[in-house]
Amino acid sequence: MEKEVHWWDKLGKPQYGSEIVVRVERDIVNFDPYFLEGLTGIFGAWMERLVSDDWTLDPEVWDYKLAWHPSKYQKGHLAESWEFPDQTTHIIHLRKGIHWQDLPPANGREFTADDVVFHYNRLYALGGGFIKPSPSRAADIRFKDLLSVSAPDKYTVVFKFKTQNPESIMETLHNVSLAQCMENPDAVKKWGDVSDWHHAIGTGPFILKDFVAGNFATLVKNPNYWGYDERYPQNKLPYVDKLSYLIMPDENEAIAAMSGGKIDIIPQVTSAHAIAIKKTNPEILQIPTSGGPTVTLQPRNDKPPFNDLRVRKALQLAIDLPSIARFHYGGLVEPYPSTLTSKDMTGWGFPYEQWPQGLKDEYTYNPAGAKKLLADAGYPNGFKTNVVADASSDLELLQIIKSYLADIEIEMEVQLMKTPDWVSFVEIGRKHEQLVYRQYGPLGHTKAPLRIITQFYTGYAANYQMVSDPVFDAFYPRAVAATNEDQLKQVIKEANEHVARQHYVISLLQPRAYALCQPWLKGGYNAQVHSIWMGSGGPSMLSFYGARFWIDHDLKKSMGH
């Protein structure tokens, strides 16, 4: 009998042992999925999801480069299977024999449907004595229709929605999000929450062993992990003995460590750094990521002066995007404004090339036109303003923007904050008065369509611009009601155009970023290397991909490491 050939055979036979070391750009401030602000949690390394990616899927079919994974390419993880008895009911059947890590107070007990109910009740205050939803989920329109979560038996979970449909339910519950990582109820009941890293307990392949803020996090293999490799069903996971994170805000320092073989993965670097390291270390693999950090200047749309569309247009006209593309990015980025949906989501947006000339003119450098708009809005002599900036963002670019605004007599004071402080001040506290600036803005998304359509929804957690526009709010129910992909694409395209015309944010550029990995890191194809930590999967996929990647020991040794 002829041996069956699989596409992954070319990746080599998996090997056990060794360690994967990952560079983390910002400090880790969160160990509890209830507190999602800032996406600086890594709890996806030991907590798991109900549904995950299809590890056996041929990359020629779907390459996981986008943050959005269509439901047809998802498979059960903690869940074994699911069904939809009607349009608004989703029934999950859990795998049997999954156990929590053997740590107190869980002590290795079995994972059951009651644990899933606890997670969703806690996150969305649906019952079980929880009256306050997660700060980040409270305003998430996608879950407004979630009526209840129940467990009719030990391995069955029933979700009841009000007006959604099977496709939107799959996207809402199971698409990539930190909110889907299951925390241990016993730990929450004992300590109130699991924010302290010492209380980290999951069902995943790695156990958090050590953490020093601003320095590192170390995870070790869970000896009692339930999972096996879907490609090699006889292989128990994980392959590596240790998963380590080195917290390195400075990209130059991270590049140096990568060049010296001390880091296996850098999730994201700029084009300039990718070009530089290709010259010094051509053996290091470079994976173009979907889009890149969508830097934007984000005004509060609910307060003067930025509640006036003319003022927001003026700021856009004051900025010379082609010059920034040429001189700041060295010509390594397209000189066009970012749009709500990244160009990488082909067919899902409203790319600049399709804009009518009148709209293009609103994004074309024109300081004289900007001054006229300011005068028409009642600011003939400009005004003073301030911006709360995340210190981990591109501060050189911020100074360039400040200079452009000064040319139209807008004096912008910069208030720098470290990422945790920025999150507390802006994302949680909403204490910013006028402008905010951060590396990862609300444009250029490759996320799920229903996630994109909520970006500027009234009251949504990530709506730092405080936009409240009934026209934009109306896109969400239309998206949920879409009965086919073409209808949904049309809604997303219209939303893109509306955002561009309303100038909710000052659009800048979307540089191409790259993930870097050492050649001895094996198991996945290129896009999946990026998938582990950023882009298509992010922190919630750490346990999934981290368990399935392995180190080619002979290759690493032959390269002197």
Question: Predicted regions span which residues?
Answer:
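Extracellular/periplasmic solute-recognition and catalytic clefts
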Residues: 129-135, 149, 209-220, 244-303, ...
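N-terminal lobe/hinge region of extracytoplasmic solute-binding protein
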Residues: 2-8, 20-86, 201
